Amino acid sequence: MLAAPAASAAVRPLDTGVSYVYDDEVAVAFQHVKAAGAGLVHTPIRWGDVAPGERPAAWQPDDPAEPRYDWESTDRWVREAVAAGLTPVLQIRGAPRWAQRCAHAFSNDSPCDLNPADLSAFATAAARRYSGAFGGLPRVQYWQGLNEPNLSLFFLPQFDSSGRAVSAELYRTLLNTFYGAIKGVDPTNVVIAAGLGPIAVPKFTIGPMRFTRELLCMKGKVRFRPAKGNCGGGVNFDIFAIHPYTTGGPTHEGGANDVQLGSLWKLKALLRAADEAGRINSQFEQTPLWITEFSWDSQPPDPGGLPMKIETRWAAEAMHTAWRVGIDAFFWFTLRDQPPEGAPSHISIESGLYFRGPTVAQDQPKEVLFAFRFPFVAHPHRKGLDVWGRTPNGKGGRVMIQILRDGKWRKAKALRADSVGIFRGRIHTGYGRNRRGAARAVYKGQDSVPFAMRSVGDFPHPPFGRPVG
């Protein structure tokens, strides 16, 4: 899948994936992932569910055959993902209460002062089980260590008793430990740092820019440089990850320490500076950046979600923005709308690529799925019409750009998608300057969603929908 970071490659790919795919009908779900054009699929191993509720007096926690572990659902998930031709990405998420060192550990999903030795043992067991050499199970190469450690919702403590931020320092120790465990099983495994939440919330959440600076022992707001010391020899991971949920459109930047779509460039610049300073120990010369979660709730079904036409347009623009700044992989959260279970619509997750049906097989695709599968944008300006897109299968070939004139689609220009399916170019035309009309791309008989010449400007909108009623 990922052979080298985009910045050093002759071509710049944008691999696509779907995150948090899990369901009883997982084989059907994976066919829907494939239908969305994605090659990567992501799910958590919930450590607190796999491990026993109490720490056994005598056991082998690093042994993949330890009988007190319950791997049944993960085994099936991995088998079905690989059988479907997908590349699995497993995230170790949460922790059992006995692996947490806080006096009061309230949740398996938001570990509090997690014991690095316990994390190492479980990560070793998981990586050995899915090494390709255990019990006939397929290999998993991509491993992510925890979830959103800059958010108090998923990682504690964020601050010590004096109010000093400590989560980045704590996570550095855990990440280095996780890296050692995963690489100790197979040095060609790929370790992904936990995806960071996008927005700073005083007293609860540390903004991802600040968190990353502290994690990597860097300083500066725009011109990044190393802080004093050697950062304990550096931070060990292969790929960095962000969840740039955006409280607006694809150009929205947020605050100084936030990372939303419009400010992805800041995080790329920080990682580049950290690479140059030798702060990151990675198998790549330039650290790749993945978006492992991103989406907006759609309307319908969320009455406070983005209208479907806008979400569809913004999804294509989001993928273009990601590719332009050098993102290597873009995951949509998630495959199907999650059941509200009595929660308000702005809290429930209705950002799926599919409307949820009675069964996975009965799910229906949303319009946004087709923009995710075959993203295409066309922006008019005084020098012509600039276009960009990615073919549905991420492969090369001839792409015909068409424009809508007098109610009919007419050929405008033929382009060539490169070996990873990216095509772009400029059509020297005045078409679209009056903000009328639309363009689309056609690849091997498949049409992209038409992209209207009338732009949709940025406006405030919560990613999971506005409160309604």
What are these regions (language model features)?
Residues 9-46:
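Boundary/entry segment of secreted carbohydrate-active catalytic domains
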Residues 421-425:
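Short strand-edge motifs at loop-to-beta-strand transitions and within beta-strands
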Residues 36-206, 247:
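Substrate-binding cleft and catalytic face of glycoside hydrolase catalytic domains
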Residues 14-20, 39-43, 88-92, 143-145, ...:
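Hydrophobic faces of well-ordered beta-strands that scaffold small-molecule active sites
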Residues 53-68, 99-114, 136-137, 152, ...:
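Surface-exposed intrinsically disordered loops and tails
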